């Protein structure tokens, strides 16, 4: 018989840097999870992504055991990395802060494909381009699709 789910916790934690301090400690402590065990497992799984923000979905069961799924870094974070920005525009419709190419959009879309609800790479690219526009980042060149 399957385990009964008690709670689902979603967090964004830097890869390889989970520790019991906020936001990890309070969120998992309230769910009754062994925080140090989660931190050890998370850091082991994300050691290849040091410093990158990794969304994680933790499923806590009634017997206080847990499973977790690490997702790819958010498109906004990858776009800021590609455009070498610290933050997006405060007024994205008026003030453009950077520009990225369609090749950069494609690499981000290919990386994000498992987490996006898109069937083709072109649709995933248009989703990432929409995120870029909402951040005040222009996409240079003609769309390849």
Swiss-Prot record:
Domain of life according to the entry: Bacteria
Gene Ontology CC: one annotated term: cytosolic large ribosomal subunit
Gene3D superfamilies xrefs: Ribosomal protein L11, C-terminal domain, Ribosomal protein L11/L12, N-terminal domain
Post-translational modification: One or more lysine residues are methylated.
Residues in the signal sequence: none
Gene Ontology molecular function terms on file: large ribosomal subunit rRNA binding; structural constituent of ribosome
UniProt keyword annotations, A-Z: Methylation, Ribonucleoprotein, Ribosomal protein, RNA-binding, rRNA-binding
SMART domains: RL11 (SM00649)
One Pfam family per UniProt: Ribosomal_L11
Single GO biological process annotation from the record: translation
PANTHER family per record: 60S RIBOSOMAL PROTEIN L12, LARGE RIBOSOMAL SUBUNIT PROTEIN UL11M
UniProt record similarity statement: Belongs to the universal ribosomal protein uL11 family.
NCBIfam families (UniProt xref): L11_bact
Function: Forms part of the ribosomal stalk which helps the ribosome interact with GTP-bound translation factors.
Subunit structure: Part of the ribosomal stalk of the 50S ribosomal subunit. Interacts with L10 and the large rRNA to form the base of the stalk. L10 forms an elongated spine to which L12 dimers bind in a sequential fashion forming a multimeric L10(L12)X complex.
Name used for this protein in its record: Large ribosomal subunit protein uL11
Organism this protein belongs to: Flavobacterium johnsoniae (strain ATCC 17061 / DSM 2064 / JCM 8514 / BCRC 14874 / CCUG 350202 / NBRC 14942 / NCIMB 11054 / UW101) (Cytophaga johnsonae)
